[in-house]
Amino acid sequence: MKFVDEARILVVAGDGGNGCVSFRREKYIPKGGPDGGDGGDGGDVYLLADENLNTLIDYRFEKSFRAERGQNGQSRDCTGRRGQDTTIKVPVGTRVRDAVTGEVLGDMIRHEQRLMVAKGGFHGLGNTRFKSSVNRAPRQRTMGTSGETRELMLELMLLADVGMLGMPNAGKSTFIRAVSAAKPKVADYPFTTLVPSLGVVRMDNEQSFVVADIPGLIKGASDGAGLGIRFLKHLERCRVLLHLIDICPVDGSDPVENARIIVNELQQYSEKLAEKPRRLVFNKVDLLEPEEARQRAQAIADELGWEGDFYMISAINRQGVKALCWDIMEFMKTQPRNMSRTEGETQPEKVEFMWDDYHKKQLEQVSEVDDDWDDDWDEDDDEGIEVIYKR
């Protein structure tokens, strides 16, 4: 299945039903009074996080979603039925933005999490609502308001504990194949990995973590070179980054310069992402003698100004891989999972919808001193049904 991590959709909430103007008609009750019911509220539009989905490809073809309109009010004080809500399923890890304002509406980070993205219109009021001591036969009603319309930008950001960085052919896909059951494509040419992939590393029956493999970066990626940096967003929720360095590049390039390119592109993309905890990992050490590999790794770390330990592995032979994974697992215990999913993200403020306060103000605008509101008809009164608050 094609991996799609961005989609633009239109959501339209249902309109509110109109209020009804009706009077009680019953034998032996000549003046039954008003009995017009209210309309029903329009249906809302929700997003629902589903862990069984892993791409937004469905929304490249179906781009418009509409909730049901509320029914109109009826006589005998019958309220119209509320419009049915519309629920849109998205993968866990989806960030929702208003495409027009750029406002972040929410992050779908838990299975079955629900988020309202468009609020249905408020119901209209029937003429029963307007009866009073001076107006016992009102002919006023209100119309239902329009449902809210939003254009949304959906951005899928993978939820992983560990993210891998490196130049093309640094051995990232080989590493994820060695530590998990994931089987990304591995070949001897650059950009074998074209889309992100996830692998679950199980240390024992109770301990595990998730690793994300993204396409390699090259110099100028922040300006669109290669596959660009569009996949770096998938590392924003990771707790730790693994910087894989090919200790003996086949193309003869300088490992120090390659490492600096990755760090530079990371900083240009996001300062917060560049400040995440990182582990320096030298891969393909099996191509050199053990002592030569250790000396070269130490020299590269010194030139980079790296402070702290580094790791020497051979992903294809699984040499040193187990020790690296256990060290990562121990680090995971010091970094709570909920922090990793909110770090670098601002908690979205409460989303304001169009009709949140409409019902509070609607009746306050009614003036009872107007001559049109009494029971007696005179030349100053209008004939027929009066519709008020139409928007």
Curated annotation (Swiss-Prot):
Give the molecular function GO annotations.
GTP binding; GTPase activity; magnesium ion binding
Q: Where is the Obg domain?
A: 1-159
Q: Where in the cell is it found?
A: Cytoplasm
Name the needed cofactors. Mg(2+)
For this UniProt entry, what is the primary localization, expressed as one broad class?
A: cytoplasm
Look up keyword Hydrolase and say if it applies.
Answer: yes
Superkingdom of origin organism = Bacteria
Q: Which keywords does this chain's UniProt record carry?
A: Cytoplasm, GTP-binding, Hydrolase, Magnesium, Metal-binding, Nucleotide-binding
CDD domains reported for this sequence: Obg (cd01898)
- The EC designation for this entry is 3.6.5.-
Q: Where does the chain bind Mg(2+)?
A: 173, 193
Q: Where is the OBG-type G domain?
A: 160-333
Q: Name one GO biological process term.
A: ribosome biogenesis
Assigned GO CC terms: cytoplasm
Specify which residues bind GTP according to the UniProt entry for this protein: 166-173, 191-195, 213-216, 283-286, 314-316
One Pfam family, please name it.
MMR_HSR1
Subunit comment for this entry? Answer: Monomer.
Family membership noted in the UniProt record: Belongs to the TRAFAC class OBG-HflX-like GTPase superfamily. OBG GTPase family.
* General function of this protein: An essential GTPase which binds GTP, GDP and possibly (p)ppGpp with moderate affinity, with high nucleotide exchange rates and a fairly low GTP hydrolysis rate. Plays a role in control of the cell cycle, stress response, ribosome biogenesis and in those bacteria that undergo differentiation, in morphogenesis control.
PANTHER family found in the cross-reference section = DEVELOPMENTALLY REGULATED GTP-BINDING PROTEIN-RELATED (PTHR11702), MITOCHONDRIAL RIBOSOME-ASSOCIATED GTPASE 2 (PTHR11702:SF31)
Descriptive protein name: GTPase Obg
Q: Which gene encodes it?
A: obg
